[in-house]
Regions:
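Extended charged
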Residues: 1-15, 76-155
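Histidine-centered nuclease catalytic patch
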Residues: 13, 20-21, 30-32, 38-70, ...
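Active-site recognition of the HExxH zinc-binding catalytic motif
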Residues: 24
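Alpha-helical segments that scaffold the active site and NAD(P)H-binding pocket
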Residues: 73
Length: 155
């Protein structure tokens, strides 16, 4: 198994930073460069579709050693409240694979769905199989909505 940081479901704390938007973007770019534009949780490498995770959960603590590059899929797991705001995900029950593996699968499905022909058809069928796992999440967690889970997780 790859040596990735564990992905933990959670909610983000809002930043109360003295940094301007351009300052924080500059800091983020330095972190991305330091991490070679590679997600520390799944290994996905891209100059786009990355964000930073604050190791201590405090988005106001913008020291480089507190920040890690994460892809947008991994980042959303740590910030379930943002998932519901962006309407970009839902909860499924899929214990057979690791979360980071699901993220690689989701990216592949996303890319294949925008193509034409057999690849797109296979991607749609794969997505249908994953969506079928929502019911198990509802049974076990009481919901498949990240917003509801994020509300339960709030202190």
């Amino acid at each position: 198994m790859a040596n990735y940081l564990p992905i933990t479901m959670g909610i983000g704390r809002k930043a109360r930073s003295a940094h301007s938007d351009s300052n924080i973007n500059e800091i983020k770019q330095k972190v991305f460069e330091r991490d070679d534009h590679t997600c520390k949780c799944c290994g996905f490498k891209s100059q786009k579709y990355q964000d930073v995770l604050f190791k201590n959960g405090n988005a106001s603590d913008t020291k480089a050693e507190n920040m890690l590059t994460t892809c947008i899929f991994c980042h959303q797991c740590f910030n379930l409240d943002a998932v519901s705001e962006m309407r970009s995900g839902l909860l499924i029950w899929l214990p057979e694979i690791q979360q980071y593996q699901l993220h690689h699968l989701a990216r592949a499905i996303y890319v294949a769905r925008i193509s034409q022909g057999p690849m797109a058809d296979a991607a749609r069928r794969s997505l249908d199989v994953l969506m079928g796992r929502r019911e198990e999440a509802k049974e076990r967690l009481g919901t498949d909505d990240p917003r509801i889970l994020s509300m339960v997780l709030k202190p």
